Amino acid sequence: MIELGVNIDHVATLRQARRTYEPDPVWAAVEAHLGGADGITVHLREDRRHIQDHDVRRLRELVHIKLNLEMAATDEMVEIACALKPEMAMLVPEGREEITTESGLDVAGKEARLKSVVAKLADAGIMSSVFIDALPEQVDAAARIGAKVCEIHTGPYAHAFHAKGRDRESAAVVAEIAKIRDAGAAVRALGMRFNAGHALNYFNVQPVASLPGVGELHIGHAIVSRSLFVGLREAVRQMKALIREAAVPFD
């Protein structure tokens, strides 16, 4: 069964808007877990725009659920990850001016550095994941650096889905799904785990969840947005139900 990792960054975004102490991301993680989340994802950015260092420490100490730490491949973040020991560390690109992660990590262009980072994380007992675009050269590079997981960037698919009025049969949407499917097959053929995420929501998640071999989906903004109206626990339950309905078994 496909797992759901719930990204709670935007709970912290709301808190940081007032530089106060609520809403508490740790409480959000507990609610997500009670709603059926299989893991919690947080992105500790270099600029600390939402999740803070104390958030990740408290999550590690207080929430008994798999933790996925999104991070840039910097010395500071590697040191934090090795001390924190999340179950998984996902290497992502970062830009100071971006609103959210805009593209996949260029693993092929930074192999030497990323191979060193992956080795350090492995020495600390941390599984390494890379967030990449659905490109063959990036999948191949991920395998060469020793990554255990590839999260395929679903943003281009999500944008096409929205632009085409949520028409799953439109040529643009079908083409983007095919790219994700083919990248996922390549990931699995190279012995890595195939995850997917970015800009997935309640309307577009099922075509991705139905792809063969998807192990885990990471979804945040859509779930946090819906939680304003139905509560976080129920928002997670609804997403899990959609994934379960669409998922196909795989070996």
Per-range role (PLM):
Residues M1-D75, C82-P86, A172:
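Conserved N-terminal beta1-alpha1 strand-loop-helix module at the mouth
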Residues M1-L4, E61-L69, V117-V130, A183-A196:
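Short beta-strand/loop segments at the ligand-binding rim of alpha/beta enzyme cores
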Residues I2-I8, I40-V42, L67-M71, A89-L91, ...:
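Hydrophobic faces of well-ordered beta-strands that scaffold small-molecule active sites
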Residues V6, A32, H43, A81, ...:
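Conserved, mostly hydrophobic/aromatic
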Residues Q16, D38-V63, P93-D106, T154-S170, ...:
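Glycine-rich, proline-tolerant flexible connector loops at the mouths of alpha/beta enzymes
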Residues R60, H162-V173, R226-V248:
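C-terminal helical cap(s) of enzyme catalytic domains, especially alpha/beta-barrels
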Residues D75-L84, L135-I145, A196, L200-V214:
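Catalytic cores of alpha/beta
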Residues M127-A186:
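Histidine/lysine/aspartate-rich catalytic loop segments that bind and position anionic ligands
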